[in-house]
């Protein structure tokens, strides 16, 4: 199989599994119901977006992803949010995990967030970037490491 076809199969299988196994996340109590595939999507996002950041920075990426799941403007599953077109740049290429220790850290932190061990350190952010360019209609909630986090202006 070509790498593009393999990637498409991966995305479709993760999305289908997510749809079948995960209910929409409307509040923090439902975050605890994430399936193994949802945790994997959350861990991959944290790894690829923040592997060079501190735990605090990686936690902020995890919380931003979960905040999107809770917001009705985004897909209702973690995998749906992570693989939504043009949202997480790394998904376009689906790179392999190369630093196993960093991935293990991302997975541990994702599981800890799901278990309720870490409060949202982004103040409800739905967006982040490393360019310090504020998306229109948003306000910066916090800067952690090389990322700035934003939420919509109400």
What are these regions (language model features)?
Residues 1-6:
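Positively charged n-region of N-terminal signal peptides that target proteins for export
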Residues 8-15:
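Bacterial N-terminal signal peptides
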Residues 17-19:
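N-terminal signal peptide c-region/cleavage motif recognized by signal peptidases
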Residues 23-154:
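Bacterial extracytoplasmic/cell-wall-associated proteins, especially those involved in peptidoglycan
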């Amino acid at each position: 199989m070509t790498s593009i076809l393999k990637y498409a199969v991966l995305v479709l299988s993760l999305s289908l599994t997510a749809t079948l196994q995960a209910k929409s996340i409307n509040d923090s109590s439902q975050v605890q119901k994430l399936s193994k595939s949802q945790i994997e999507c959350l861990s991959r996002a944290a790894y690829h977006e923040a592997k060079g950041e501190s735990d605090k920075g990686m936690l902020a990426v995890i919380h931003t992803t979960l905040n999107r799941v809770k917001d009705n403007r985004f897909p209702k599953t973690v995998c749906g949010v992570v693989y939504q077109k043009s949202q997480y740049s790394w998904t376009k290429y689906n790179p392999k995990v190369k630093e196993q220790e960093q991935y293990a850290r991302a997975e541990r932190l994702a599981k800890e967030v799901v278990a309720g061990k870490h409060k949202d350190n982004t103040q409800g952010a739905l967006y982040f970037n490393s360019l310090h360019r504020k998306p229109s209609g948003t306000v910066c909630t916090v800067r952690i490491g090389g990322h700035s986090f934003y939420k919509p202006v109400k």
